[in-house]
């Protein structure tokens, strides 16, 4: 109420954002357009609205178009999602299905936060060779593929510190950055000149510059062909 009689120039960025969201919600419109509506809000309010907005729109007989750079927000809202890259729609479909089966490597990169880990691999029988010296078992995802060169993609939450490993596929890297949020650890490591990211529950205080042994869940890997298209 205190904001109702104020002009836009008299409101802060966060207040303008909250007012715009409220106006969109109270209107009985058939089409609601929201362009990064949570971007200028403080952390606490942003998290509250992330939970509340899907509930508010669920009971509305309206089409909601929600633009965001956050994959987590797209997954939270569900429905259908279109991913854009350089002004081009790379994929459109059910949100959860797109996350599990991105059409190509560009869509996988857009729809992953932290960024999906990718590198070239060589499949030979039941073995994958990556970074020239690291060998992994092929895993379920690549078992039916012909021998040859592919690009592999593994999401950060499928890479864990060795103490938590439950599947094969180990490698070592030099720790570049560690991010501790209290409930999870995000570890950036240099592997063969590329930066890979591990995201796991709990606190894992790796020292910057130290060696870290990580394990990848190879069964969850995505395999892409020479043109970047998803193969398996």
Q: For each predicted feature, which ranges?
A:
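Glycine-centered flexibility sites
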Residues: 13-14, 39, 87, 93, ...
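Internal, well-ordered alpha-helical scaffold/interface segments
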Residues: 96, 105-109, 148, 157
